[in-house]
């Protein structure tokens, strides 16, 4: 399977993100799909709000105007949190990583419960100010993290075996992952 094992839907989304709006025919050609398979692939993405159909465009020759498919940048909002020894940095982004709003607060209390509560508070404040509730939260920090959930060791915060993602998820009601900051940066740049 080409596409690195990704589903057809994921490949379609990535194509629209990287190449911009295109017709169903162009998308199908790019992915090597028949017209019927292209339609079956994009229909659930349109229904989920991940892809939007743009108004028809005149093609300049015979035939019907062509509707373009485009990635819907407002389809999701993600909260990103960066913890340092003395500050908490928070942003809300669209799925492409475009920062919508951000804030930075001093980290005066470093026990895990206080930090989880501060994260929940700042995420709620950013959501209120932007009018966009995040769909998920990602936290990065200079620490050993396992399973994208548990901070094994964060010396600068005095933490050992802290289930940070679960704590923040419980405080916010949102899915949450945690990652080592260098790994998170490398993943974002990949």
Range-by-range predicted roles:
Residues 99-104, 108-120, 124-190:
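Glycine-rich phosphate-binding loop and adjoining helix at the ATP-binding site
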Residues 16, 27, 38-51:
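Basic amphipathic alpha-helical segments that dock to polyanions
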């Amino acid at each position: 399977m080409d596409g690195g094992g990704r589903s057809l839907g994921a490949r379609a989304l990535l194509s629209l993100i990287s190449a911009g709006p295109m017709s169903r025919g162009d998308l199908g050609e790019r992915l090597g799909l028949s017209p019927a398979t292209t339609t079956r692939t994009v229909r659930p993405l349109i229904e989920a709000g991940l892809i939007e159909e743009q108004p028809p465009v005149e093609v300049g020759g015979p035939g019907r105007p062509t509707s373009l498919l485009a990635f819907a940048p407002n389809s999701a909002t993600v909260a990103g949190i960066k913890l340092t020894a003395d500050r908490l940095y928070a942003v809300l982004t669209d799925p492409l990583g475009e920062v919508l709003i951000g804030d930075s607060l001093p980290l005066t209390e470093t026990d895990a419960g206080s930090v989880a509560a501060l994260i929940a508070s700042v995420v709620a404040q950013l959501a209120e100010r932007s009018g966009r509730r995040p769909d998920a939260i990602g936290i990065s920090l200079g620490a050993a993290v396992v399973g994208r959930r548990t901070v094994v060791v964060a010396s600068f915060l005095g933490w050992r075996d802290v289930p940070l993602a679960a704590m923040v998820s419980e405080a916010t009601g949102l899915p949450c992952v945690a990652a080592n900051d260098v790994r998170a940066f490398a993943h974002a740049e990949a």
